[in-house]
C-alpha cells in the first residue's frame, strides 16, 4: 500500500472525504493486554474485525504491538513476577525478565502464524519495546532509572527483532529509527520516522528532519532499506498546525520523496484546503506508480498454441512494491467472459524507480478455446492472484481494475 494512512479510522471522528486524501492503508496500534487478555487466549477477533472494516474501505492493515502504552502488558503477565513501573502514559515492564520474553515470543509467534502471510496485512511495525512501542524511554519522566534498568539489553533487543523477522517472514516490516534499525534493515526491514515535517517544531536549535534522520541514514544499509522494505512516516503534530505556523511545505514534501516514502500517517486529521493540491501532487509520486510504456504480442494464435507477450514498464514513483504481487494477462470474449488467464514469473518487487527490465512471457492458449477475436487485458494482482490489486497509471481501466489494451485473434 501507499499514500496517506487511515489512523485507527479517525478514532471515531474520521475527517470528511474532502478533508483527507483517499487511503489504502489502515494503521492500528494495540496494547498486548488487548491482544492477549487472558494467558494463551489471543484476541484475533479484534484484529479480524478491523481487517473486515478496512477491506470495506478498500484498505489493507498495518499494525504495531505495544507493551507499555495505556493498558500495556497484561496484568496476568505482571502477576507472574515481571517487574514494572508506572509512568506518564502507562506501565513500563521489565523487558529483560525471562517470563516477559517467553510470553512475548509466544504472542508474536501466534500473530505471525495467523497474519504473517495474510493478503490483508500491508506491513508490520516492529514495536513491542519502550514508550508507545517506539524503542525509547521518553515517557519515563521521574522514573528514568527504573525504565533504564527495565529497557532490554542489546541481546534481548536483537532477540525480539528476530521474532518479527522469523514469524512475519512473508510480511513487509518497518522499524523506527533507533533501537535495532540497522540490524532489522540488514534483514530486509524498512524504516519509519515519527516526527516527519519537524524543521523547528520543538526547538530552533534541533529538529528531526535535519538532526535525527540524516545521521541514521549515513548507514548505507538504512539509506538503501527502501529497496526492500517500506518507508513509513508519521507527521509531527498535525498538518493543520504546520499550516498555521507557516512551515515550508515544499521543503518537507521534497524530503519525503528523497527518502523514498511509501506511507504517510497524517493521523487522520484534516489537511488544509489551501494545501490539498500540493498534497495531491505529492501523492502521485510517493510509493510506486507503474506506467506500461509498450506492449507487443502475437497478433494471432491457435488453441494449444503459444502467445508471446513482451512489455516495457516504468515506475514513476519513488519506491517499489513490497509484496509479491504478480503481473497477469487474460483473454476476454465478446460476452465479457474470461476464457484464459496467466501470471508472469516477473518479480515486480525489483521494479525500482525508473525503467523496469523488459518482461517477456510466452503463454499457452487453452486447447478448448474457440476461434474468434478476444480482448487482451493486463493487471497486477494481489498475492493470492484472486483479484486485480494495483491501479496503473495508464488508460483502459475496467471496473475490476484490469486494463483493456489490445485484441488477439484465435484461428
Regions found by a protein language model. Give the residues of each.
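Short catalytic/ligand-binding loop motif for oxyanion handling, primarily in non-cytosolic enzymes
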Residues: 35-36, 69-76, 130-136, 181-185, ...
Amino acid at each position: 500500500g501507499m499514500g496517506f494512512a487511515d489512523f485507527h479510522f479517525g478514532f471515531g471522528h474520521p475527517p470528511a472525504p474532502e478533508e483527507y486524501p483517499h487511503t489504502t492503508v489502515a494503521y492500528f496500534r494495540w496494547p498486548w493486554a488487548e491482544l492477549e487478555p487472558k494467558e494463551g487466549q489471543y484476541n484475533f477477533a479484534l484484529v479480524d474485525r478491523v481487517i473486515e472494516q478496512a477491506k470495506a474501505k478498500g484498505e489493507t492493515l498495518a499494525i504495531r504491538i505495544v507493551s507499555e502504552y495505556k493498558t500495556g502488558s497484561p496484568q496476568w503477565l505482571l502477576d507472574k513476577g515481571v517487574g514494572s513501573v508506572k509512568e506518564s502514559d502507562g506501565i513500563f515492564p521489565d523487558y529483560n525478565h525471562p517470563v516477559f520474553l517467553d510470553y512475548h515470543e509466544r504472542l508474536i509467534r501466534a500473530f505471525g502464524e495467523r497474519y504473517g502471510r495474510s493478503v490483508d496485512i500491508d506491513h508490520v511495525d516492529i514495536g513491542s519495546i519502550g514508550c508507545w512501542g517506539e524503542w525509547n524511554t521518553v515517557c519515563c519522566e521521574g522514573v528514568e532509572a527504573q525504565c533504564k534498568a527495565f529497557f532490554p539489553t542489546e541481546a534481548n533487543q536483537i532477540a525480539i527483532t528476530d521474532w518479527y523477522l522469523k514469524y512475519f517472514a512473508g510480511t513487509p516490516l518497518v522499524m523506527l529509527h533507533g533501537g535495532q534499525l540497522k540490524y532489522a534493515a540488514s534483514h530486509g526491514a524498512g524504516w519509519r520516522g515519527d516526527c516527519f515535517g519537524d524543521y523547528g517544531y520543538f526547538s530552533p536549535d534541533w529538529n528531526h528532519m535535519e538532526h535525527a534522520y540524516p545521521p541514521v541514514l549515513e548507514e548505507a544499509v538504512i539509506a538503501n532499506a527502501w529497496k526492500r522494505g517500506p518507508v513509513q512516516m508519521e507527521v509531527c503534530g498535525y498538518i493543520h498546525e504546520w499550516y498555521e505556523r507557516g512551515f515550508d511545505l515544499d521543503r518537507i514534501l521534497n524530503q519525503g520523496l528523497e527518502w523514498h516514502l511509501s506511507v504517510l500517517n497524517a493521523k487522520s486529521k484534516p489537511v488544509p484546503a489551501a494545501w490539498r493540491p500540493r498534497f495531491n501532487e505529492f501523492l502521485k509520486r510517493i510509493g510506486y506508480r507503474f506506467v506500461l510504456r509498450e506492449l507487443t504480442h502475437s497478433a494471432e494464435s491457435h488453441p494449444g498454441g503459444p502467445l508471446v507477450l513482451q512489455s516495457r514498464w516504468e515506475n514513476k514513483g519513488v519506491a517499489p512494491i513490497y509484496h509479491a504481487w504478480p503481473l497477469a494477462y487474460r483473454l476476454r470474449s465478446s460476452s465479457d467472459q474470461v476464457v484464459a488467464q496467466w501470471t508472469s514469473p516477473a518479480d515486480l518487487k525489483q521494479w525500482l524507480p525508473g525503467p523496469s527490465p523488459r518482461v517477456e512471457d510466452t503463454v499457452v492458449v487453452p486447447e478448448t478455446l474457440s476461434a474468434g477475436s478476444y480482448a487482451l487485458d493486463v493487471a497486477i494482482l494481489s498475492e493470492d492472484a484472486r483479484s486485480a490489486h494495483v491501479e496503473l497509471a495508464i488508460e483502459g481501466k475496467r471496473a475490476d481494475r484490469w486494463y483493456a489494451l489490445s485484441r488477439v485473434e484465435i484461428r
